[in-house]
């Protein structure tokens, strides 16, 4: 049986509801939290999707904030999205260490002024973009070695 476009979209949406973090993520985030880092999510996802992912993975006490593109009505890598945490916390752009597995997002955050780190789990080659990451890690635990 062929699935309709709507059925495929619902199937994909349902899969996003049950995403689990990689094995080292929770422990690493807890260690960062104990070192008094403010931790936030900055995503193209919707607030309800992101909130459910955080709740379903028992990460509610780890993240200080969840920023969604819905707050500004435009997708990353538009600079309005990257402004969200800067404006909320009244901090300088270069005070933020921004991590992403997406090269376009690393580049967008870096061009905005963040210190961007590429989470390159598959040891890919960074896309030929106009920004090179501050650093590259292969899993989140490596972040503890560079901060």
PLM-predicted stretches and their roles:
Residues 2-4, 26, 33, 90:
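Short, flexible hinge/linker loops that cap or flank conserved catalytic cores
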């Amino acid at each position: 049986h062929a699935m309709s476009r709507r059925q495929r979209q619902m199937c994909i949406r349902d899969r996003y509801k049950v995403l689990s973090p990689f094995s080292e993520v929770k422990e690493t985030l807890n260690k960062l939290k104990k070192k008094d880092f403010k931790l936030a999510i900055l995503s193209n996802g919707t607030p309800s999707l992101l909130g459910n992912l955080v709740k379903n993975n028992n990460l509610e006490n780890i993240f200080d904030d969840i920023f969604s593109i819905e707050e500004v009505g435009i997708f990353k890598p538009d600079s309005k999205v990257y402004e969200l945490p800067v404006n909320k916390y009244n901090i300088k752009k270069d005070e933020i260490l921004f991590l992403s597995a997406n090269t376009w997002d690393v580049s967008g955050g870096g061009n905005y002024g963040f210190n961007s780190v590429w989470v390159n789990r598959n040891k890919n080659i960074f896309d030929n973009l106009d920004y090179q990451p501050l650093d590259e890690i292969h899993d989140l635990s490596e972040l503890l070695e560079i901060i």
